[in-house]
């Protein structure tokens, strides 16, 4: 979907909006109104996690908003998972102040497109997707090529993906119980 047409396409494709807590439980709220910048400043147990569920050609995609840190400021985006919660349907990224021609390239198709078809799980373990300096190779299901000269921004994308995907593991486990939930979350209930 073209960025410029997102507001028109949104109601056509997005069928459900959820707000989750750290346990993967639905809570009150409007996903579109969740401000990740503010949420990330909160304790993990207090964060609201927005989730959008779209449908394309009769198949669901789970869209997770992302926010992290680049070299000069915030980076953000969305990653969309297919209904198996493993294969990436697509990813988009953006920034406010990354270096033109270097880290600023995260919002270009040559960087975003290779995420499609990658996997975030190896078996039941979350691997996420790593942005790899020097190239990932076509057979690497958990990596994409980094941006030459944009190492810190690339590392920021890697960290952002892992951190945000980890937050959604409890929800993933509720709808697909074979997914291993990181021990960080199971130990939180005892705190």
Where are the model-predicted features located?
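Flexible, solvent-exposed loop/hinge segments and secondary-structure transition points
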Residues: 1-191
